[in-house]
Amino acid sequence: MNYFRILYCSVLLFFSFFSCTSAAVSNHPIHWGFQKNNNHQPPDAGKEWNELLNKYGAFYLGDPSKKEIYLTFDNGYENGYTSKILDVLKKHDVHATFFVTGHYLKTAPDLVKRMVKEGHIVGNHSWSHPDMTTISADKIKKELDAVSDKVKELTGQEGTVYVRPPRGIFSERTLALSEKYGYRNIFWSLAFVDWKVNEQKGWRYAYDNIINQIHPGAIILLHTVSKDNADALDEAIKTLKQQGYTFKSLDDLVMEKMFESPFLY
């Protein structure tokens, strides 16, 4: 996948020179969210948001006609469970994307190195986890580039192509700027309240949320700070594979979209 990422970064940077300025687009903050479906059908973000994400090459969903799913984790800080999560992923030969912050890179460098060594993608969750709609264009670039540079320094991975905006807050301006700087925003179509470390409810809570919400093309968001997630992951992966789902990487998703619509993505 490293060769694809190098090629993709080059292509994205090339087209960024021809991007329109972000000064003319809206900076109205949008909080990512959707009405959950429990009938194994993908949620619909609505025509306006779908068009906005497509305009800037962002994703929240894969192909809803295929039982292919994408496992992603947000790593704001280390809470002692990432090693177990990595062990489970290795056991099942499943690759994921881990969106890390500057704090995580500074405090858990060995885990970040392990992620890349074991075939996972390290994504960008910004250096200091700000609301991107409240900071300048220069600051947005610094937030993203600092993570990307540190990941490359630690692991050799060529850039953090994929960005998950902190707290899911974004605007058309932040989408335009991140694309201009060579990044692609990745949202999600399956998530639940799992980040409250003092309100964990047991592995079954996480397992049921994943299995009840799963749908073709799902981009799954989990937080590594959750003991429930770490304890549920093994059984969840077993069940999903038994149901015929295949785990794919974000590189697979983007490559597929680029071949389908080369001038859009």
Swiss-Prot record:
Domain annotation NodB homology: ranges: 67-248
Annotated keywords: Hydrolase, Signal
EC number from the UniProt entry: 3.5.1.-
Keyword Signal: yes
Signal sequence segment: 1-23
GO cellular component labels: membrane
Any single Pfam family the record assigns to this protein: Polysacc_deac_1
InterPro entries in the record: Glyco_hydro/deAcase_b/a-brl, NODB_dom, Polysacc_deacetylase_ArnD, Spore_PdaA
CDD domains xrefs: CE4_BsPdaA_like
Record flagged with keyword Signal: yes
GO molecular function: hydrolase activity, acting on carbon-nitrogen (but not peptide) bonds
An individual GO BP term: carbohydrate metabolic process
Origin superkingdom: Bacteria
Family annotation (NCBIfam families): spore_pdaA
Family: Belongs to the polysaccharide deacetylase family.
Protein name as it appears in the record: Uncharacterized 30.6 kDa protein in fumA 3'region
